[in-house]
């Protein structure tokens, strides 16, 4: 019997169609470029630096975070199930000279091949795009070394996140294309922590990601009502 992959074909197709514009700083992925320094600094600070670390970026897309970690001196592998985003990621790395690998594979498949391999695993803005986020979390836990770090980021599911992420970001401000997100797939922090608790990971820190449309500015803060990041360590 063929094992069913933890992949939503509609989600893959959506990002395949936008792949050529992944590194357009004023295009659909502008918000990812804007928040990337925040994500990079958060991972760097909480993991005790990146230089020389072996890192897996799950759901890497066109490689924005993966490439920035490689530039910091990490040994990075980017993992995704979108062929076009990975092609764009590889081409951009050639242009910049960044040294990293990209692999077309699910997190679950990678975990079977490379258990307890990575010092750091990042899984950013990905869990809300797969049918079974708990399976991805378990795979990330399997792939990280003992005492290694795993980072997850996603969107909370409540009225405010619908207003900000769907109505605001997609419909009014057009920060991202309509249909980028499905509010029903957003994950409450309590739900994410419950899934983490089913693995050897222990949650250590949580922070929110905030946006001011008047100043077009992002920052990290205490409130986790919309976007948030969780730092975990493998026991």
Curated annotation (Swiss-Prot):
Pathway: Cofactor biosynthesis; ubiquinone biosynthesis. One of its GO terms (biological process) is methylation. InterPro entries: SAM-dependent_MTases_sf (IPR029063), UbiG_MeTrfase (IPR010233). Its EC number is 2.1.1.222, 2.1.1.64. It is an enzyme of class 2 (transferase). S-adenosyl-L-methionine binds at residues 39, 59, 80, 124. Keywords: Methyltransferase, S-adenosyl-L-methionine, Transferase, Ubiquinone biosynthesis. SUPFAM superfamilies: S-adenosyl-L-methionine-dependent methyltransferases (SSF53335). Coiled coil: none annotated. Pfam families: Methyltransf_23. GO terms for molecular function: 2-polyprenyl-6-hydroxyphenol methylase activity; 3-demethylubiquinol 3-O-methyltransferase activity; polyprenyldihydroxybenzoate methyltransferase activity. Belongs to the methyltransferase superfamily. UbiG/COQ3 family. O-methyltransferase that catalyzes the 2 O-methylation steps in the ubiquinone biosynthetic pathway. This is Ubiquinone biosynthesis O-methyltransferase. The lineage of its organism: Bacteria, Pseudomonadati, Pseudomonadota, Gammaproteobacteria, Vibrionales.
């Amino acid at each position: 019997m063929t094992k069913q992959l933890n992949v939503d074909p509609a989600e893959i197709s959506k990002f395949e169609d936008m792949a050529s514009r992944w590194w357009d700083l004023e295009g659909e992925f502008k918000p990812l470029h804007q928040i990337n320094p925040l994500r990079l600094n958060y991972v760097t600070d909480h993991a005790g630096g990146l230089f020389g670390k072996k890192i897996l970026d799950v759901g890497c897309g066109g490689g924005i975070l993966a490439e920035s970690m490689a530039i910091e001196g990490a040994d990075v592998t980017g993992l995704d199930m979108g062929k076009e985003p990975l092609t764009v990621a590889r081409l951009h790395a050639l242009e910049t000279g960044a040294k990293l690998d990209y692999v077309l594979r699910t997190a679950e498949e990678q975990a079977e091949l490379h258990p307890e391999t990575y010092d750091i695993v990042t899984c950013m803005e990905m869990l809300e795009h797969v049918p079974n986020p708990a399976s991805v979390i378990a795979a990330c836990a399997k792939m990280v070394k003992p005492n290694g770090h795993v980072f997850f980021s996603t969107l909370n599911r409540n009225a405010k996140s619908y207003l900000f992420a769907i109505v605001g970001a997609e419909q009014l401000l057009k920060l991202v294309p309509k249909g980028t997100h499905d509010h029903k797939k957003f994950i409450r922090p309590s739900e994410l922590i419950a899934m983490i608790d089913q693995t050897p990971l222990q949650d250590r820190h949580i922070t929110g990601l905030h946006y001011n449309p008047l100043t077009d500015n992002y920052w990290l803060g205490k409130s986790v009502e919309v976007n948030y990041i969780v730092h975990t360590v493998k026991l």
